[in-house]
Each structure stands twice: as C-alpha cells, then as structure tokens.
Amino acid sequence: MITPKVLSGFKDRLPKDAIQKAQLLAKVSVVFQSFGFVPIETPHLEYAEALLPDASSDIQKEIYRFKDHGDRDVALRFDLTVPLARFVSLHHQILGMPFKRYAIGNVFRGERAQKGRYREFTQCDFDFIGSESLVCDAEIIQVIIASLKALDLEDFCVSINHRKILNGICEYFGVSQVNEALRIVDKLEKIGLDGVGEELKKECDLNSNTIKELLEMVQIKQNDLSHAEFFEKIAYLKDYNENLKKGIQDLERLYQLLGDLQISQNLYKIDFSIARGLGYYTGIVYETTLNDMKSLGSVCSGGRYDHLTKNFSKENLQGVGASIGIDRLIVALSEMQLLDERSTQAKVLIACMHEEYFSYANRLAESLRQSGIFSEVYPEAQKIKKPFSYANHKGHEFVAVIGEEEFKSETLSLKNMHSGMQLNCLSFLKALEIIGENDEDL
C-alpha cells in the first residue's frame, strides 16, 4: 500500500485554502482588468534554452530541468516573465504594441522550503510591453498599490531603485563583474552585510576597503526623508558617472509621476540595496514588503527590462512589470485574520426531513441561485442535527429546513448559523430578504 505524502516544498490545498486563494486571485484580476490588462496563458513546460539565458546562476541551480520522452531538453518555468518574452516574440504582430498583459499561474524553483516559500508557487504577473515611457513604470507601481489595497492591506512599502544606479556604483568602484556583484547584493536581506562582503571578496575579487565603501553606498535609503530632501541629499552622486546621473534622473521623473497620481508618499521609498537577482532587469526595480511582516520577504516585485526579446528576435521589445506572490500573501493575510475561513462558497444549506421533499428543495435552491445566492442541498433526508453539524463544519451562514409543514405551505424555516436565531415558515421572498442582507460575503 502506498503511503500518501507530499513532496517537501509542495502542498495540497484543502477547500478553505483553495477558496481563499481563488478569492484573492479574483480581487487582483479585477484590479488588472480595471487598468486595461488582458489575460494570457503560457505552458508550464518550455524548452530549456528559452529559460536559461536570463536566469541568474542561483536560479539556474533551482530550475527543474530534464529530458522529455522525445529526448528534448526541457524545463519547468521558474517565473512568468521569460515565457512572456517567448510569447511576445512569437505573437507580437497579432498582439499589437504597446501590449498590457496579466498572467496567473504556477512556477517552479527548487529552493529551500520554508515559511511562505514553496518550490511550486503561484505568481500573478502584470506587464506593459512595447513602451520605454516612465509613465508605464509609474502605472505598474500604481497597480501594485491598488492590488494590495484590494486585499485590505494598507501598511506596506514599495522599495524602489534603478539598475543604472547600481551599475553606476559598480562602475565608480571599478567592479568588472557587475551582474555577479548585483546578484550578491540582492542577497543582502538573506545573508547580511558580512555574508555579502565575503561573497563579493570571493566571487568578484574585491578588496576589503572597496567592499566597505560599496556596501555603504548600496545601503543608502530614503527612510523618513521627504522626496525633495532625499533627492537633494543624493544630488552629488550625479557627478560620479552617467549611469548614476541617468538612474537618479529617472527616479526623479518617476516620483513626479507618482505625485501626480496622488499616491501616498508613505507607500513608496527609494532603497539602493534593491537589486533584483534576475539578470534581465535594466531600469527601475522594486520590491514590496509588509511593514509588520518583513521577514516574509517581498510580496510583489518587478522592474523594467529593456531587452525582453533579445534571445528570440532581432526586434527589441522593452517592458516593465511586476509579480505578486499570492502564496506569501495568503500566509500574511491568514496571520492578520483577513481571510475567509469558510470551507464552502455556498451561503445556504437546504436540509430535508423526508425524501419526498427533495424536489421542492432543489427548486428552492435553484431559485436562490438565480437570485445570486450560492446554495446547496444536503443529499440525505436526516434528523436536523446532522445537516446543522455539516453546516457548522463547512461555514454555511444559513440552513433552510424543509419539514412537513414547510413542504405543504411551500415555505421554509431559516436558521442563522452565526446568531442561532431561527425563523419558521417564511415565504421565499422574506427568506431572500434576510439572506441577502450580507451580500458582500458572497
């Protein structure tokens, strides 16, 4: 006999968990659609050559790669952005540019399993393809903020940086292995200053003084300074080189656009340590953390990539986008008690006291559904205790009881499972009025 078990880093979703996830995805999808983003789908499995060029060395170690039955070198996607590059290159003439898309799907990384981190997890990506305008970058940040607010989150911060600033810092300190250095800097939160310093010394052959000064610069943060105060503080960096000058100018323009959108300044700050480990980022980058749960890591991250299709097409298409980590958000929202704890989406359970009442019960359930009330019929004629126990376990708000009197008079008795109050022999319209008082729970 096979012992039922799940691989480490993977998980089953019980009904309650699956409902919570579906509700979150529905909410963020509405936000995406409200900004004009349209859905697409790409396969879980791609040719390995399509995925590997843009993966950092760390992520390449985590990719699930194998030979399929046709002896082809294939891999499970590790994010939704690289498949997007292949998708856009294949279909760009049909899509038209600029193109705004969102995609929701599972991705796979063989990283160490821990709280809020899985080897299979769901990403919600939204991207603006085919425009180099910073208006697009500002809109992506606007969508991040709107999405988190749609999930009833208010206390978070989008930490923003620019890859040109990081490139400029590396240039200033004479770092030749820029991508490798930035990959290491991106691990600052995970391994700390000492760990980053050791790796920079080992992998990039930097001396201790250079490492010390470089790390001091990448730790520059806006913190509680106003936008104007911060840009005044870092203005001297524009004189160091063109990369730093261009990066800071782009951030100044971005902040002007975000200000025009009247987004609260508490929700976004500049942080020079934000690097994003994926090698395809070229411009503004960002990571979003919940202020009271920073140990969970970024719940939404992304940035600009100006060479999206370079591996697939001579026609260069740039883009900017972000990815919401739904699984991490579920962990956070659960701890904050902001999730629906029911194991059913049906608001009403209809219970029959006798077999012959099922035809009436089914008609009643269908009438409720047509009125927008999710309903189900308990499948067995039982003493009332068993359906009530079932409703308590699943989380139905109401139980409609059909006994002899209700059957004959074509009424129903209705019990509120939260308050315990029961009203007998109600007309359908009266019951509908009572049930519909809390439609936001549907």
UniProtKB/Swiss-Prot annotation:
Quote the PROSITE patterns the UniProt record gives: AA_TRNA_LIGASE_II
Q: What is its EC number?
A: 6.1.1.21
Q: Which domain of life is it from?
A: Bacteria
Predominant location = cytoplasm
Q: InterPro entries, alphabetically?
A: aa-tRNA-synth_II, aa-tRNA-synth_II/BPL/LPL, Anticodon-bd, Anticodon-bd_dom_sf, His-tRNA-ligase, HisRS-like_core, HisRS/HisZ, HisRS_anticodon
Instruction: Enumerate the UniProt keywords alphabetically.
Output: Aminoacyl-tRNA synthetase, ATP-binding, Cytoplasm, Ligase, Nucleotide-binding, Protein biosynthesis
Biological processes, Gene Ontology terms: histidyl-tRNA aminoacylation
Its quaternary organisation is: Homodimer.
HAMAP family noted in UniProt? His_tRNA_synth
Q: Which PANTHER family match?
A: HISTIDINE--TRNA LIGASE, HISTIDYL-TRNA SYNTHETASE
Output this protein's name: Histidine--tRNA ligase
Give the species this sequence originates from.
Helicobacter pylori (strain G27)
